[in-house]
Regions:
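Membrane-interface extramembranous regions
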Residues: 1-152
């Protein structure tokens, strides 16, 4: 029994030591990889993005949008790697997540197979709850900003 307790303690310490770096790296991989696929026109998500684009945006071409959106995702990924830039990347992630979840409501014929039965595209979107949870974990490690009082 003592061996299990020792293993348990070691695993917990390992996870406590490395979770934050792994969370940052995982978010980088997801956002940079998926973003760069969009930039080079290789993203399997492009048809879904295009359907949402056609339902919402009309001020630029889709070809331009998908490249810019891919670059935006790459930047999010890179920023998650850099400690100290969390307050910049978290609002960017919020904007991205809002747009990512929109097809669940705006394109139900694509994202749902039936009531509470997501299609493959719907599952792809819903799994972003894990991305949000991971980002919340990173955000929970921030220290509150303090107002500096200046005397005249």
């Amino acid at each position: 029994m003592q061996e299990y307790i020792t293993l348990d303690v070691r695993l917990i310490h390992f996870f406590q030591k490395y979770w934050l770096g792994m969370a940052r790296f995982g978010l980088f991989v997801i956002f940079f990889w998926f973003g760069i696929l969009k930039v080079f026109g290789l993203s399997p998500a492009a048809p879904l993005v295009q359907k949402l684009f056609e339902a919402t945006i009309s001020f630029m071409s889709f070809d331009t949008f998908i490249i810019l959106f891919g670059i935006f995702e790459c930047v999010i990924g890179i920023l998650f790697l850099i400690k100290g830039l969390e307050r910049i990347v978290l609002p960017m992630l919020l904007l991205h997540m809002i747009t990512t979840f929109m097809p669940l409501f705006m394109l139900p014929e694509v994202t749902w197979s039936g009531f509470l039965v997501p299609s493959l595209e719907g599952q792809y979107i819903i799994k972003n709850l894990v991305v949000i949870a991971c980002a919340m974990g990173i955000a929970s490690q921030l220290h509150p900003m303090h107002r500096h009082q200046h005397s005249n």
